[in-house]
């Protein structure tokens, strides 16, 4: 599944199969010398325009049908089958089609660290099958999530097309400054084992909210019917717009009710994204199924302690005179609309503000700013939630800064995780804006 430059999100049929040593791949019958798929070729195509002016011309809708000559290219399919893992869908055919039809010359590839092992392979495939004038650039900077799509760096490198792997279309395509293709890298897992595990551990009639990262989103929707028919488990995929149904991010998740759900089930490895749903829904028990280890575990989060720590930080920040406003520059993490809103409100409350741009935020770095009494960071909310205690001075999220100024509320142990929701702070909005009542 992927999002294309037309803005359509859809599934594809191309499924790569198991990898092998590149040296053992069969010889190509093509007259072009065969690469070993271990690096990128030299040379660069014409530089793309670096204009940041948004094109407002409405273009006609185009059907993105991948030509048979690409889908049925025997040499291409052999390379995919022998160099990339069979259960990871890198959508190579679609990528080649978009590059060709848009006449792109210099391609930027951006992916999280876990996929960089395949970066040079994909780079070589694109260069060989898109033509001799094509060059690629692998963007090796850290990519934490969908907020890190880095079109600005791609433009600075002279690229005219960006392929962003393993994250959903969090940053709208029409706001990105060059052509972009989001490749979700959907991963196939053993759904039979999932159904057996759930059937053994959960009672018939259990109301399950199933969530996961975008890689496992197709699996979530496949499991819904199977769990109902084979285990009697009523499974639904909650949604917070504009994310997909069942999709959860470390900073953004759906708010659920105990009247509707008995449990939250997260499909994926690690806890980072699951913790978002746990923080947003502290009264609903949470479980995690790891498709790699095939383990099902009950997960816990100390909501009381977390909220207590954040309330103390907010209270301490209230006494500040000078507040540093951090704009994250890692990809698209920072939102200038959010920054401007916060600065205006802080100044109106009598706080002196200073804006600091940082790609990554560390305690030692902020300690250098001795004249700042407290910080508000427009980058990643989880940085404050998870690591705020490690900073010498309060490090607030935009939401917490609004609570500090009595522009939002933090009641009891309820802590919202809607940063990139449709009306979230990550989009320059105020989700719980106070409405003026006419008298």
From Swiss-Prot:
It is found in: Cytoplasm. Binds 1 [4Fe-4S] cluster per subunit. The cluster is coordinated with 3 cysteines and an exchangeable S-adenosyl-L-methionine. [4Fe-4S] cluster binds at residues 147, 251, 380. It is an enzyme of class 2 (transferase). Its main location: cytoplasm. InterPro entries: DPH1/DPH2 (IPR016435), DPH1/DPH2_1 (IPR042263), DPH1/DPH2_2 (IPR042264), DPH1/DPH2_3 (IPR042265), DPH1/DPH2_euk_archaea (IPR035435). Residues 11-54 are annotated as: Disordered. Its EC number is 2.5.1.108. GO terms for molecular function: 2-(3-amino-3-carboxypropyl)histidine synthase activity; 4 iron, 4 sulfur cluster binding; metal ion binding. Its cofactor is [4Fe-4S] cluster. Pathway: Protein modification; peptidyl-diphthamide biosynthesis. It catalyses: L-histidyl-[translation elongation factor 2] + S-adenosyl-L-methionine = 2-[(3S)-amino-3-carboxypropyl]-L-histidyl-[translation elongation factor 2] + S-methyl-5'-thioadenosine + H(+). GO terms for cellular component: 2-(3-amino-3-carboxypropyl)histidine synthase complex; cytoplasm. GO terms for biological process: protein histidyl modification to diphthamide. Residues 44-54 have a biased composition (Polar residues). Keywords: Cytoplasm, Iron, Iron-sulfur, Metal-binding, S-adenosyl-L-methionine, Transferase. Belongs to the DPH1/DPH2 family. DPH1 subfamily. Catalyzes the first step of diphthamide biosynthesis, a post-translational modification of histidine which occurs in elongation factor 2. DPH1 and DPH2 transfer a 3-amino-3-carboxypropyl (ACP) group from S-adenosyl-L-methionine (SAM) to a histidine residue, the reaction is assisted by a reduction system comprising DPH3 and a NADH-dependent reductase, predominantly CBR1. Component of the 2-(3-amino-3-carboxypropyl)histidine synthase complex composed of DPH1, DPH2, DPH3 and a NADH-dependent reductase, predominantly CBR1. This is 2-(3-amino-3-carboxypropyl)histidine synthase subunit 1. It comes from Yarrowia lipolytica (strain CLIB 122 / E 150) (Yeast). The gene is DPH1.
């Amino acid at each position: 599944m992927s999002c294309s430059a037309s803005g359509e999100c859809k599934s594809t049929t191309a499924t790569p199969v198991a990898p092998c040593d590149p040296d053992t791949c069969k010889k190509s019958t093509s007259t072009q010398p065969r690469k070993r798929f271990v690096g990128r070729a030299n040379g660069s195509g014409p530089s793309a325009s670096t204009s940041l002016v948004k094109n407002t011309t409405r273009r006609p809708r185009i059907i993105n049908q991948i030509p048979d000559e690409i889908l049925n290219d025997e040499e291409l399919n052999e390379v995919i089958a022998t160099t990339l893992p069979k259960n990871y869908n890198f959508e190579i055919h679609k990528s080649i089609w978009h590059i060709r039809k848009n006449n792109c010359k210099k391609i930027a590839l951006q992916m999280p660290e876990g996929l960089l092992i395949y970066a040079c392979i994909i780079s070589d495939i694109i260069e060989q099958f898109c033509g001799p004038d094509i060059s690629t650039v692998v963007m090796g900077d850290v990519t934490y999530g969908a907020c890190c799509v880095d079109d600005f760096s791609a433009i600075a490198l002279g690229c005219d097309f960006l392929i962003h792997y393993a994250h959903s279309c969090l940053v709208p395509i029409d706001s990105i400054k060059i052509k972009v293709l989001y490749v979700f890298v959907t991963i196939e897992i053993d759904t039979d084992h999932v159904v057996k595990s759930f059937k053994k551990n959960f009672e018939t009639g259990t109301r399950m909210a199933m969530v996961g990262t975008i890689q496992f989103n197709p699996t979530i929707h496949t499991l819904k019917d199977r769990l109902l028919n084979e285990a009697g488990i009523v499974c639904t995929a909650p949604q917070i717009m504009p994310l997909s149904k069942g999709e959860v991010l470390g900073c953004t998740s759906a708010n659920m009710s105990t009247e509707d759900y008995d449990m939250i089930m997260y499909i994926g490895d690690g806890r980072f994204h699951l913790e978002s749903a746990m923080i947003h829904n502290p009264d609903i028990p949470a479980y995690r199924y790891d498709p790699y280890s095939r383990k099902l575990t009950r997960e816990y989060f100390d909501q009381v302690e977390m909220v207590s720590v954040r309330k103390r930080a907010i209270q301490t920040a209230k006494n500040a005179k000078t507040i540093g406003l951090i704009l994250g520059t890692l990809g698209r993490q920072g939102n200038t609309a959010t920054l401007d809103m916060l600065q205006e409100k802080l100044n109106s409350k009598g706080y002196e503000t200073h804006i600091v741009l940082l790609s990554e935020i560390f305690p030692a770095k902020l300690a250098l700013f001795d004249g700042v009494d407290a910080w508000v960071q427009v980058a990643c909310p989880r940085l404050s939630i998870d690591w705020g205690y490690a900073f010498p001075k309060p490090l607030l999220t935009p939401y917490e800064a609004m609570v500090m100024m009595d522009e939002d509320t933090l009641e009891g142990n309820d802590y919202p995780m809607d940063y990139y929701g449709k009306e979230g702070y990550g989009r320059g909005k105020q989700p719980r804006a106070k409405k003026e009542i006419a008298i």
